[in-house]
């Protein structure tokens, strides 16, 4: 039985993950963590998530380390915000707890810190900007398509709900990095984030990224390969957060077989090249 701790336990993703874990035969929720000094502290995590009573009380993040030790968690799952997640990963790995992280918006420095903490504490980890199985097939297909369409102009468009805080999305940034890498282009030099005013003629090297926010859009990502007289639009649409949660469950199950001291990706989880 895999013992799982969930941060952001009262959020949309955290609650969904808790509900899904209660439906599995090989894992259980042993800890539920919310923001420091959360007003929900003491509330049963299962009741809060709509999964029925679990006997696991929500605690504030100020008690993270003692909670992980007392619960003997095998894996911590984090879907929160970047600056909080970095601290969570640091503390969890120091406690010898493996991590599955779907939080987005990490800076290069924050991601480097995550990688260092996983390595220094020799724990197992899966960190991905998008846990959806379909999106990771999307990334894998982009990797194969891009060299073939290397002479096309490339634009990335993403759309999310009006509560999303970071832009462009982590998924759009991953797609951008996959494309730039396949074309041997420096992301720092070729990324163009929206356009306004007299920006001049589009260069052949640039890759555009555009963010739309509105309503309850779960997550749409389109990569346009635009040539003279034709274009290819490659799109992934998430209709429900359940697609991300299904990927989280796969990632949790992968952890026991993962290599220690390195950060695995969803490619590793899914066995993609």
Swiss-Prot record:
Record: active site: 160, 164
Descriptive protein name: 4-hydroxy-tetrahydrodipicolinate reductase
Protein's cellular compartments: Cytoplasm
Enzyme Commission number(s) from the entry: 1.17.1.8
Entry similarity comment: Belongs to the DapB family.
Keywords attached to this entry: Amino-acid biosynthesis, Cytoplasm, Diaminopimelate biosynthesis, Lysine biosynthesis, NAD, NADP, Oxidoreductase
Catalytic activity: (S)-2,3,4,5-tetrahydrodipicolinate + NAD(+) + H2O = (2S,4S)-4-hydroxy-2,3,4,5-tetrahydrodipicolinate + NADH + H(+); (S)-2,3,4,5-tetrahydrodipicolinate + NADP(+) + H2O = (2S,4S)-4-hydroxy-2,3,4,5-tetrahydrodipicolinate + NADPH + H(+)
Native species: Methanobrevibacter smithii (strain ATCC 35061 / DSM 861 / OCM 144 / PS)
Domain of life assignment: Archaea
Binding site for NAD(+): 8-13, 34, 102-104, 128-131
Pathway: Amino-acid biosynthesis; L-lysine biosynthesis via DAP pathway; (S)-tetrahydrodipicolinate from L-aspartate: step 4/4
Record: residues binding (S)-2,3,4,5-tetrahydrodipicolinate: 161, 170-171
First-level EC class: oxidoreductase
Stored HAMAP family: DapB
GO cellular component entries: cytoplasm
Function: Catalyzes the conversion of 4-hydroxy-tetrahydrodipicolinate (HTPA) to tetrahydrodipicolinate.
GO biological process entries: diaminopimelate biosynthetic process; lysine biosynthetic process via diaminopimelate
